[in-house]
Amino acid sequence: MDGGSGQPAADTEMTEAPGGFPAAAPSPQMPGIENIPATLSHGGRFIQYNIFGNIFEVTAKYKPPIMPIGKGAYGIVCSAMNSETNESVAIKKIANAFDNKIDAKRTLREIKLLRHMDHENIVAIRDIIPPPLRNAFNDVYIAYELMDTDLHQIIRSNQALSEEHCQYFLYQILRGLKYIHSANVLHRDLKPSNLLLNANCDLKICDFGLARVTSESDFMTEYVVTRWYRAPELLLNSSDYTAAIDVWSVGCIFMELMDRKPLFPGRDHVHQLRLLMELIGTPSEEELEFLNENAKRYIRQLPPYPRQSITDKFPTVHPLAIDLIEKMLTFDPRRRITVLDALAHPYLNSLHDISDEPECTIPFNFDFENHALSEEQMKELIYREALAFNPEYQQ
């Protein structure tokens, strides 16, 4: 949900956050707009807004004003008030959602996953807006709880971040990830823009369109996680990846928070691998055991890199934080620290409370992924999800 964010999430019982920060201004590409044209449609049950020449059609409970707050490849995000609940939400319009089957499945996956999950550190879906016509719709509108900004915007800003801020963000990412992994799910696309924040420093993980079941071993051709946060086993095309891929991403994100620039900003796959080996060193034969022969051969023909001292490279970072990061940025995923052990690491002693780090009691069922769904079937499944929120719109 790039760039989509403003209004606090529900108050939590979590450990008190460090001092908050002012909400980020709207994205420069999406200036605030007064008096966006609005027209009632379909007998007054819907409202059409005209935003930058795009039709944005939602149920009539989302009364004016409506504010564009973000834009991505998928479409546009607006903040709006639900007049029935008085809650502000971020509504993402996915335009032409069924033109591409892979994208349509991503949308369905995200909806089903977020409806299954219930956790303070995972963004919640508040509504799937039903289409006016059951059998003739191409756009999907999803309303999420509204947050103020995301970690990418904060890192790029000149907003001061204390070590306590960074530590608290790290804790919340791991707390959310514990729940995700306990649901038998890998996120697979953790990066700063997928971590939403509000002014209280509450953090919520979003964008589950690439999530996968943890026991799945076939490599997905659609897998396009941002290169900079990608674990070495994925860069080397290992099909047998585990929850450890998310832990690697968290290590990269934390160091980016501390240093205000990406840890491994690779230009391509080859450069990405070189950057990470320049820091953590060329893996030993023992550390290569989990890889296939092609990947082993590739690593062996690279020039050897000695391991650098992360402490020397980042002298201002707390020694306990360095110790945890070294355990996260371990080449061999079998030896990489788990989320549970990371939460229990001494660096997070002041925040860790196992009684307030819930797990998901029912694993997520990805069975719908196993069927070759037609466009009409995917439309029907998304329509049913919309009816779960809006039974009165049954047609």
Curated annotation (Swiss-Prot):
The gene is MPK6. This is Mitogen-activated protein kinase 6. Belongs to the protein kinase superfamily. CMGC Ser/Thr protein kinase family. MAP kinase subfamily. SMART domains: S_TKc. Residues 17-27 have a biased composition (Low complexity). Interacts with MEKK1, MKK1 and MKK2. May form a ternary complex with MEKK1 and MKK1 or MKK2. Interacts with NDPK2, AP2C1, MKP1 and PTP1. Interacts with DSPTP1B/MKP2, especially during HR-like responses triggered by fungal elicitors. Interacts with MKK4, MKK5 and MKK6. Binds to LIP5. Interacts with VQ4 and IKU1/VQ14. Interacts with RACK1A, RACK1B and RACK1C. Interacts with PTP1. Interacts with FLZ9. Binds to BASL and YDA. The modification Phosphotyrosine is found at Y223. Changing K93M: Loss of kinase activity.
